[in-house]
Amino acid sequence: MPEKKGSADAKVLHCSFCNKSQHEVRKLIAGPSVFICDECIDLCNDIIREEAQATARAAIRSELPTPAEIKTFLDQYVIGQTSPKRMLAVAVYNHYKRIRHGEIKGDEVELSKSNIMLIGPTGSGKTLLAQTLARMLNVPFVMADATTLTEAGYVGEDVENIIQKLLQNCNYDVEKAQRAIIYIDEIDKISRKSDNPSITRDVSGEGVQQALLKLIEGTVASVPPQGGRKHPNQDFVQVDTTNILFIVGGAFDGLEKVIRDRTEKSGIGFSAAVRAKSERGVGELFSEAEPEDLIKFGLIPELVGRLPVVATLDELDEAVLVQILTEPKNALVKQFQKLFAMEGAELDVRPDALKAISRKALKRKTGARGLRSILEGALLDTMYDLPSQGNVSRVVLEANAVEGVGKPLLIYADESEAASGEKAGRGEVRDAAA
């Protein structure tokens, strides 16, 4: 017979963990010969949640490459630019750490995004740095040219086309696209034409900056599915850009003058100003860039504020260009040696030829970007003839061939072709024009 409520003989149940009675707690849940109260359940949940968060934080640290590891990877492909590489490594590490941090529930601290601006001369490695970062982190990457962008409604591409390209790159996997890296090149070409707000509509300058602003700071962009055109009754793909890392780059021709004018205002006397101008190069001046200089150059203050990490790249000198030709993992000379090896020939680029190529690139003011066209031009005739000549074992490129006053030397493996007087087995050295 069940005990009556309020009976003196009624057994009072207690929590098996905290020993509180059933009258001191809201709920007491029974198990096989044990009881647990709602307060102990809450405590257990808190302990499990804390352990899960600690595990998640440890996973973040273990999965993400450290800034030092990121820089080491960049060193394999990009020569020099130590300071920009360190800044990029820290910024990218913090960005993806921030994304993982946002996945941990229960943390009230919200971390803001730090997008990146790269300032440097043409061919100094801005695009290569961004591409190499994306490859290391195994995230989608898309590159856009700011000069092709116009305000929505005008002829040209609007800023949402960038997101459309990104989706196409990752097969419309929205989750993957929302962790991508977007590089916008030639950002300096959309600077407004004067310091004063535009009176007339500037559809490819300040207007584009305003459109980019929303995308960079984080918004939900509506993109037509599978690259279709927009129309009112269409279902759009929604992409949140909050966790997309934006890197913008530009040569900023003329910015050095803005910086020089600001920094030399305090100079006393004519000789001080002249000496300062002669001693400081473009790269050194760029390193002194302040937000006010970028605004004076023509970027709107809101956009400058959304790009807090500013990395300036140095000008490339002859020695660095020689290193770029030979040292990176996918160095240009190594690429051409691979092409020649496919034809059974060894390519030997002499040190004087490397210097001649570098000097030519400096003269053209194309930086590292011009190295390929110069090397290709020097070897073009040889690459044309080589597949038809099966007995060439070695091609030697010297400075005179780069400068256009000679041709690469061909060394033939067939001893019967050797000129009289040459030692047997030494092979014949012939001019490529022969």
UniProtKB/Swiss-Prot annotation:
Annotated family: Belongs to the ClpX chaperone family.
UniProt-recorded name of the protein: ATP-dependent Clp protease ATP-binding subunit ClpX
GO cellular component: HslUV protease complex
Binding site for Zn(2+): 15, 18, 37, 40
Residue ranges of every copy of the ClpX-type ZB domain listed in the record: 3-56
SUPFAM superfamilies: Glucocorticoid receptor-like (DNA-binding domain), P-loop containing nucleoside triphosphate hydrolases
Role this protein plays: ATP-dependent specificity component of the Clp protease. It directs the protease to specific substrates. Can perform chaperone functions in the absence of ClpP.
Gene: clpX
GO molecular function, one term: ATP binding
Pfam families tied to this protein: AAA_2, ClpB_D2-small, zf-C4_ClpX
Gene Ontology BP, a term: proteolysis involved in protein catabolic process
The entry's keywords: ATP-binding, Chaperone, Metal-binding, Nucleotide-binding, Zinc
Binding site for ATP: 121-128
NCBIfam families attached to this UniProt entry: clpX (TIGR00382), PRK05342.1 (NF003745)
InterPro entries: AAA+_ATPase, ATP-dep_Clp_protease_ClpX, ATPase_AAA_core, Clp_ATPase_C, Clp_protease_ATP-bd_su_ClpX, ClpX_bact, P-loop_NTPase, Znf_CppX_C4
Subunit structure: Component of the ClpX-ClpP complex. Forms a hexameric ring that, in the presence of ATP, binds to fourteen ClpP subunits assembled into a disk-like structure with a central cavity, resembling the structure of eukaryotic proteasomes.
Record carries keyword Transcription regulation: no
Organism from which the protein derives: Bordetella pertussis (strain Tohama I / ATCC BAA-589 / NCTC 13251)
HAMAP family assigned to the protein according to its UniProt record, in alphabetical order: ClpX
Keyword Thylakoid: no
